[in-house]
């Protein structure tokens, strides 16, 4: 709203009073834009070197890893960077390290700064300015000091009243105005979906097996699961195979281990944690389970538990080097270590000339410890070393994309995620990370497509009802559709009354997208 000035000629005393009041109506209804200058500093030469050297013997084409430039304001469709910075890219749930809102899995769209607001929104903020009391005591407080029969007021009251009416007319919005293009009717739905946690049951204390399992009668379902995993089959089928193996032999350590890892990769956090805990109950020093469970706790912002697990991982993996002294009790071993102390131990191990395989494991853990300690460059160097040594490891590409995304280098992060997706097409987690990166970049159409892929991948082979499908993926899909103003697709999703129709609707929406 433009600043309103009162033009009164002569040396009228009311003119002086009015000027003294300094009416600044432009402060009413003015909103600030949040702007964040993305840090896009990337070492292009290092990245190009990685991509150049990692292609040897690989059929996958070279990806141009360029430094991410700050996205143009027009590409954001009005969604502020500050809103989406709360979003857990989740470290692809591989490692999100800084404390954040635990509900940040759901991304919040915002309004364009030039969008018109509906009459209800206007009345909420400006209704107070219509009241007579406000007009007398706020707009022109000097009126209460003048009697109606004052000789001063009789001369200018008419002109004063006309200016006041003009001012109120500028504030006034007709009640019958409809702003259908903005889509505020969907904001209420967004407010319902943003807090989806109430729809989720409490975390179970025991692993939740599928009720129906096609592999339960097979002779060796564990072997079937390993073959499915190696061949890049749908992760739901891999989960069923390992669950069948455990049903036949509850003490199968490797089945529990692989089941936990696959559940994490399929974005089933609670079952993944429970499976790995069962593995550790059977084999307390299983280093693979310790590492993956430690990473999971970092994702859950439980840093103290993750540090305990990393400490135990070091003692278990390098037991010949670190042998507890006779006076060292269990309490001292379980004491929470400092990140810097653990990193120093691992750095010392690297200088001892250990085996190559152990070096890879140390660099993997160091990359996580460095990042959680906000040492971004050191973390990147660890991952870059691993990529040079293992260019076809999809998990490392996923983690590398995650660290780039958390430094807001979204273009480079998307390239890394796509590399991982090429190597592991069944990796549900990397598709979800891609969706989050696209949303942070402001590309809501691609984000919507990737979220639909995630939902369809996770629904394959499972018996779902519609209520169970209202998870964080569906909520983020709805928010992406709202942000892109694709309200027709949102209506189609809301109009699906059962799982079959919902899946068919999602496929139809996906095929219509550019």
Curated annotation (Swiss-Prot):
The keyword Repeat applies. TPR repeats lie at residues 174-207, 218-252, 254-286, 288-320, 326-359, 360-393, 394-427, 429-461. Disruption phenotype: Leads to a clear mislocalization of both MLS1 and MLS2 to the cytosol. GO terms for cellular component: cytosol; peroxisomal membrane; peroxisome. It is found in: Cytoplasm; Peroxisome membrane. GO terms for molecular function: peroxisome matrix targeting signal-1 binding. Keywords: Cytoplasm, Membrane, Peroxisome, Repeat, TPR repeat. It is a peripheral membrane protein. InterPro entries: PEX5/PEX5L (IPR024111), TPR-like_helical_dom_sf (IPR011990), TPR_rpt (IPR019734). A motif (WxxxF motif) lies at residues 91-95. The keyword Cytoplasm applies. GO terms for biological process: protein import into peroxisome matrix; protein import into peroxisome matrix, docking. Induction: Expression is induced by oleate. Signal peptide: none annotated. Pfam families: TPR_8. Belongs to the peroxisomal targeting signal receptor family. Peroxisomal import receptor that mediates the peroxisomal import of both malate synthases MLS1 and MLS2 in oleate-grown cells. Recognizes the C-terminal peroxisomal targeting signal PTS1 sequence SKL of MLS1 and MLS2, probably via its TPR domains. Interacts with the PTS1-receptor docking protein PEX14 but not with peroxins PEX1, PEX3 through to PEX8, PEX10, PEX11, PEX12, PEX13, PEX15, PEX17, PEX18, PEX19 and PEX21. The WxxxF motif is involved in the interaction with the PTS1-receptor docking protein PEX14. PANTHER family: GH08708P (PTHR10130:SF0), PEROXISOMAL TARGETING SIGNAL 1 RECEPTOR PEX5 (PTHR10130). Interacts the PTS1-receptor docking protein PEX14. Interacts with malate synthases MLSL1 and MLS2. Interacts with TLG1. This is Peroxisomal targeting signal receptor 9.
